[in-house]
Amino acid sequence: MARYIGPSCRLCRRENMELFLKGDRCYTDKCALKRRNYPPGQHGQGRSKTSDYGVQLREKQKVKRLYGLLEKQFRSYFDRADRMKGVTGENLLSLLERRLDNVVYRLGFASSRSEARQLVRHGHFVLNGRKATIPSIQVKAGDTIVLREKSRNVAAISEALDAVVRRGIPQWLELDRDAFTGLAKTVPVREDISTPIQEQLIVELYSK
């Protein structure tokens, strides 16, 4: 499956949920989901009954799009979560939340996950004292993420940090705004992830 390059707002409408793919725009009245709260397409406003499989598939698609992953990547995370001790669905969400690009977004250095991914790839961050350019790196408890000094005047990053108060920072993370430093205090558990996700539906889908 190729990476989606169409309008981001169509994805939010398709999943009937704000995926925050457009950064600050998603918090304004310009959000497409607020203006047209129905799926895109000619028959978007029509009602249709969805099967159990359809409900499970939509949940998987929603989470994939939320974190910006392709099917092969997402399945790899699921298989890894399934091999871990504990509840598979909760393990899956914890792995996704601990991706470096997601942590950069959660700390407020970027207004969207796609922007965070680009910043990581361009080498704007240091993880535990070493330059990190791989968005999928797993952040562990005790890890520190520091914005490189030469990047601290980037307008987009400053604007994102100023706006982070709007969505808040998860309890498992800590931000020192003055030092441009983030800390992973612990590994995220289900209670730390406020995004409305029914992960059990994904487990049921992949268990067929």
UniProtKB/Swiss-Prot annotation:
Keywords attached to this entry: Ribonucleoprotein, Ribosomal protein, RNA-binding, rRNA-binding
Pfam family, one: Ribosomal_S4
GO biological process, one term: ribosomal small subunit biogenesis
Domain S4 RNA-binding: 98-159
PROSITE patterns: RIBOSOMAL_S4, S4
GO CC, alphabetical: small ribosomal subunit
GO MF annotation terms: rRNA binding; structural constituent of ribosome
Family as reported in the entry's similarity comment: Belongs to the universal ribosomal protein uS4 family.
Database matches in HAMAP family: Ribosomal_uS4_B
Description of how the protein assembles with itself and partners: Part of the 30S ribosomal subunit. Contacts protein S5. The interaction surface between S4 and S5 is involved in control of translational fidelity.
Protein role: One of the primary rRNA binding proteins, it binds directly to 16S rRNA where it nucleates assembly of the body of the 30S subunit. With S5 and S12 plays an important role in translational accuracy.
Protein name: Small ribosomal subunit protein uS4
Organism of origin: Trichlorobacter lovleyi (strain ATCC BAA-1151 / DSM 17278 / SZ)
